[in-house]
């Protein structure tokens, strides 16, 4: 027998307006992030942006293959996925910049930057993944839609941030093509900040 697990009634006009508002906020947030990454990280920011767009294609393709409909919780999951993907790239890039400030060459700095940023990225995504599984297991309706988008997004984000960008960087370095991780303006930003939390 059929069992109703969730029921929400929204007028067609209101539902369409909500979807449009959610999509508009998604586009604005994406545009701001893309611009900021290029402004702050220059060439590496462009690589990050390409990885982010590829990540979106992977995620939307996976959702389409599952026959998922675009809902507000789904849009929220996509936006959160973008944030997590950017966070992973920022962790890697800041680690690389730190290695470069320590006097290491670009190739060594990139290798060490990725290897030393792995644990923080995996830990952050693993805890979020566990939370998403709990939401999917005990939630219903819209909550499950959000959790599904988030679970898929975590895997696509890890792939784009850890695998895709690494391949691009090492391909360029092996072909003696330069990569910049900062602009002249942002080179020394936040390097002398020392917050005494205790």
Predicted regions and their residues:
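Extended, hydrophilic extramembrane loops/domains of integral membrane proteins
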Residues: 1-6
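Residue-level signature of catalytic and energy-coupling elements of molecular machines
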Residues: 14, 33, 62, 90, ...
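Interfacial segments of transmembrane alpha-helices in multi-pass membrane proteins
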Residues: 15-71, 137-141
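Small-residue-enriched core segments of transmembrane alpha-helices in multipass membrane transport
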Residues: 46-67, 78-85, 146-161
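Short helical (or helix-break) motifs at transmembrane helix termini and adjacent helical loops
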Residues: 81-100, 121, 158-163
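Helix-loop junctions and hydrophobic alpha-helical segments within the transmembrane domains
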Residues: 100-126, 183
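Hydrophobic alpha-helical segments
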Residues: 115-171
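Interfacial helix-loop-helix hairpins and adjacent transmembrane helices
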Residues: 159, 163-198
């Amino acid at each position: 027998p059929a069992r109703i697990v969730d029921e929400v009634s929204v007028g067609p006009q209101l539902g369409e307006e909500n979807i449009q508002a959610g999509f508009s906020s998604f586009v604005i947030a994406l545009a701001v992030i893309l611009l900021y990454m290029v402004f702050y990280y220059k060439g590496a920011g462009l690589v990050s942006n390409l990885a982010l767009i590829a990540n979106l294609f992977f995620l939307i393709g996976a959702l389409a293959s599952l026959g998922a409909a675009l809902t507000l919780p789904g849009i929220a999951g996509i936006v959160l996925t973008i944030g997590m993907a950017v966070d992973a790239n920022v962790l890697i890039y800041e680690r690389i910049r730190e290695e470069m400030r320590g006097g290491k060459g670009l190739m060594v700095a990139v290798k060490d930057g990725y290897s030393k940023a792995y644990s923080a990225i995996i830990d952050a995504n693993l805890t979020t993944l566990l939370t998403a599984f709990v939401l999917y297991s005990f939630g219903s309706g819209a909550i499950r839609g959000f959790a599904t988008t988030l679970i898929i997004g975590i895997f696509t984000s890890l792939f784009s941030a850890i695998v895709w960008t690494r391949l691009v960087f090492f391909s360029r370095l092996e072909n003696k093509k330069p990569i910049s991780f900062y602009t002249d303006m942002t080179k020394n930003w936040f390097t002398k900040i020392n917050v005494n939390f205790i």
